[in-house]
Design a protein with these regions (language model features):
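Start-transfer (signal-anchor) and selected internal transmembrane alpha helices
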Residues: 1-62, 607-608
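Transmembrane signal-anchor helices characteristic of membrane glycosylation enzymes that use polyprenol
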Residues: 45-72, 247, 347-350
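Membrane-embedded helix bundles of polyisoprenyl
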Residues: 56, 130-131, 135, 145-186, ...
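Transmembrane catalytic cores of multi-pass membrane glycosyltransferases
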Residues: 61, 68-77, 87-90, 97, ...
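Membrane-interface junctions at the ends of membrane-embedded or membrane-associated helices
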Residues: 96, 183-196, 227-235, 323-339
């Protein structure tokens, strides 16, 4: 199976069976009715892509009506969509982990999800992806059972929806579109390679902008094409994702680690090599991609990275399709035939079980929808918006989207960021002493313990500690759903001579009593800026005219700092790089992160 093979023609349809035709009065053969089932079958064979798209649409509508909830990955996507909806021009979300760039999650997904709705985006992405996958299967001549393989694809995309991976699904929609541009390019235009690249490369870039994981999977396909000396297709699919990742990492720095256990490794690794050994030997591109993916999966397990367990998604989406496509090439009831059937069945059991498990495990308790109001009311009464609030993460992670508009969360729902900034919840070292140190480090003023099961990773020990009682946590309010604790003598979010008036998700407002340096416990970002009451960035410190006209260029420059500026504090023992305000006078200062041509309000080196 290669990209260079001619594809099925656009109007390639199944010819009617001569046995089911009869000669009309004018001498022409006309189809003889052979039952509604045969008629339906012929229509399906004539329009397999349309049929697949319709089935996928129905499946995703059923998902929306009966299974979509507000927990798990959906909670994170709800949070990002709501954040960019409320603050479309802000580059830094202060309500999660002290501060996170939306772009570090996805470049375009939050904005599209805010515009279309998170669940609507999932339905569109899953449906279009299934249709494009069917198009690829139908157009590649090596696939003898494209309709059956298309239905396997529908099931895989439905399972992805069950797990709530909207951002990934959106990225895969563009990724499959880019792949279709390479593998389904009309044969009569086969020499117009620049036209193919002009279609595939932007889609590959959009795929990576939608989901870096989708861009990684395009890299697997690009590597397979490159190793098989199909360089134009490889460049079209592989260069744009690299550019998008490099640019976003440079402009919006982020680091973190996604965990990956041996159990998580086993699934994608085993199926990568099952595909490699079970598909026909002349499917060079498929076999090379499987080998690259298998080696890459092992490397992801060995080397900590932001990818981690996310690498399994390529096998979950496409291994079943490829295995089913290989089935007609085996002898019925031979050993290889049984191996393909068992592998295909095992793959679908795995992704089906995973989808159902994600729904059950992440379904929010009723308290998150029915009785959230009393908790929010209590948080407002005690002035929780002047510091951070730690909500012990429930299994649904519903707090990540339910509370950021009211208070700043010490955590959120991003496993990579959580493991990077809060390792004590994952390394089995959590105890009353270092928990207090952690509360002080992140300027946590209140702790909320919800009823229900905590997150299986990173919250069980915390829930146990808080539930049993700690000397520095005072229970100030509770009902059957929530327990609210106040931290004794909490560390302020901004050190004296400043006081915090409000810590919002898009803006931090502080009052400074006298000129000087103020340590603010917000992780530094080059986009952080001092803004006016309308959110517009203030002028940076400017060099004086005398300094510009100085005779000796080796003498230090002098600056006028009218509005204040921000410094990155040197990394401390916990790995934190906080923000420091250089305030020229007493008054109110507002920190935000507006998108602007010159990001932030940095202090020049001479003022450090």
């Amino acid at each position: 199976m290669t990209a260079a093979e001619p594809t099925r023609a656009d109007d390639d349809t199944a010819a009617p069976d001569p046995a089911h035709t009869k000669r009309g009065s004018d001498g022409e053969r006309t189809p003889e009715p052979s039952g509604r089932l045969d008629g339906l079958k012929q229509k399906c064979l004539r329009h397999p892509v349309l049929l697949t798209t319709a089935v996928a649409a129905v499946a995703h509508i059923l998902w929306f009506l009966f299974f979509a909830n507000s927990g798990g990955d959906i909670a994170a996507q709800d949070a990002w969509a709501e954040f960019v909806g409320r603050h479309p021009g802000t580059a830094y979300n202060l309500a999660w982990y002290g501060g996170m760039h939306p772009v570090s999650y996805s470049v375009v997904s939050p904005y599209l999800m805010s515009l279309l709705g998170v669940r609507t985006t999932m339905m569109i992405a899953g449906t279009v992806s299934a249709g494009l996958t069917s198009l690829i299967l139908y157009r590649v001549k090596a696939v003898r059972n494209p309709l059956a393989c298309s239905m396997a694809g529908v099931f895989a995309y439905l399972c992805n929806a069950l797990s709530g991976r909207v951002t990934f699904g959106l990225g895969m929609m563009f990724a499959v579109g880019a792949t279709a541009a390479v593998f389904c390019w009309p044969y009569r235009w086969r020499y117009k390679r620049w036209a193919k690249a002009a279609v595939a490369a932007p889609l590959a870039g959009l795929a990576t902008a939608g989901s870096p994981v989708a861009g990684l999977f395009l890299g697997v396909v690009a590597a397979a094409l490159f190793l098989n000396k199909r360089r134009p297709g490889a460049y079209a699919l592989g260069l744009a994702p690299v550019a998008v990742v490099a640019l976003s990492a440079w402009l919006f720095p982020f680091s973190g680690t996604q965990p990956m256990s041996v159990a998580t490794l086993s699934g994608p690794f085993v199926f990568a090599w099952l595909v490699f050994f079970l598909v026909p030997s002349d499917w060079k591109t498929v076999r090379t991609a499987s080998a690259v993916y298998g080696v890459g999966t092992l490397a992801t397990y060995i080397v900590d990275s932001q990818i981690g367990s996310n690498v399994s998604r390529m096998a979950m989406l496409f291994a079943g399709i490829v295995l089913l496509a290989a089935l007609p090439y085996t002898t019925p009831r031979s050993r290889k035939w049984y191996a393909v059937v068992i592998a295909f069945a095992s793959l679908n059991f795995w992704i089906g079980f995973k989808g159902v498990d994600d729904i059950v495990r992440t379904a929010p308790t009723a308290s998150w929808t029915r009785s959230l109001g009393p908790l929010v009311n209590q948080l407002q009464k005690v002035g929780a918006e002047r510091g951070r609030v730690e909500v012990v993460p429930p299994s649904s992670h519903r707090e990540a989207s339910a509370l950021p508009h009211s208070v700043n969360l010490a955590r959120g729902w991003n496993r990579q960021a959580d493991m990077k900034r809060n390792p004590l919840f994952y390394d089995d070292t959590l105890d009353p002493v270092n928990y207090r140190q952690w509360l002080d480090r992140w300027a946590v003023h209140y702790v909320v313990l919800p009823q229900g099961d905590p997150d299986y990773s990173g919250a069980r020990k915390e829930a146990e500690l808080v539930g049993k009682g700690l000397s520095y946590l005072k229970l100030i309010w509770s009902n059957k759903d929530w327990r609210l604790f106040e931290v004794d003598s909490p560390v302020p979010l901004a050190d004296p001579p400043a006081t915090v008036e409000r810590a919002g998700e898009g803006e931090l407002t502080i009052h400074v009593k006298k000129a000087g340096r103020v340590l603010i416990r917000v992780p530094y970002s080059p986009w952080l800026a001092l803004v006016d009451e309308n959110g517009k960035g203030l002028e940076r410190p400017r060099e004086t005219e005398a300094s510009k006209q100085r005779a000796d260029e080796n003498t230090p420059r002098t600056f006028v700092n009218e509005n204040g500026c921000l410094l990155k504090v040197d990394e401390d023992e916990d790995g934190d790089e906080w923000t420091e305000l250089l305030a020229p006078r007493p008054g109110t200062y507002r920190l935000s992160a507006p998108y602007q041509f010159q990001p932030g309000t940095p202090c020049p080196d001479e003022l450090r």
